[in-house]
């Protein structure tokens, strides 16, 4: 999702149009990550938390594809496990309500 966001900003296109054009039945896994802004461009560096516009793209992907394996990529400037875990759990907000509550209960146990 971050790759789509970064490309949409650098090449000026609507990221939701891109997501809507992907054949949902072909999606096996979704990757989310943060990025870094360098002057006029954004680089997919996987070294920051996921920003709200990327979560919005993720939300649309989940709406189209349903519950899909999701990987949080964080490859540099890695914070504590607790912070990475909190960031990964944000993905549950975008699951259908019943699935989200079930997953949150399992994680809390």
Label each residue range with its predicted role.
Residues 14-21, 49-64:
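A short, acidic, amphipathic alpha-helical segment used as a generic capping/interface helix at domain edges
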Residues 81-104:
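C-terminal helical cap(s) of enzyme catalytic domains, especially alpha/beta-barrels
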Residues 43-49:
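Short, glycine/charged-rich beta-strand-loop motifs at protein surfaces that mediate ligand recognition
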Residues 69-75:
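Conserved active-site loop/cleft motifs that coordinate metal ions or position small ligands
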Residues 1-41:
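Acidic/histidine-rich catalytic cores of soluble enzymes
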Residues 26-28, 65-68:
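Short, well-ordered coil/turn segments that N-cap beta-strands
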Residues 31-42, 61, 74, 81-85:
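Catalytic core of soluble alpha/beta enzymes
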Residues 77-82, 107-109:
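Extended recognition/assembly regions associated with phosphoester-bond processing machinery
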């Amino acid at each position: 999702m971050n790759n789509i966001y970064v490309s949409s900003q650098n090449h000026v296109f609507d990221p939701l149009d891109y997501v809507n054009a992907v054949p949902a039945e072909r999606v096996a896994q979704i990757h989310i990550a943060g990025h870094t802004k360098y002057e006029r461009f954004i680089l997919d560096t996987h070294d920051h938390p996921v920003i709200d516009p990327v979560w919005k793209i993720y939300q649309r992907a989940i709406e189209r594809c349903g519950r899909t394996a999701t990987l949080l990529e964080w490859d540099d400037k890695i914070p504590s496990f607790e912070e990475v875990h909190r960031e990964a759990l944000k993905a549950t907000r975008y699951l259908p309500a019943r699935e989200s509550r079930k997953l949150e209960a399992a994680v809390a146990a």
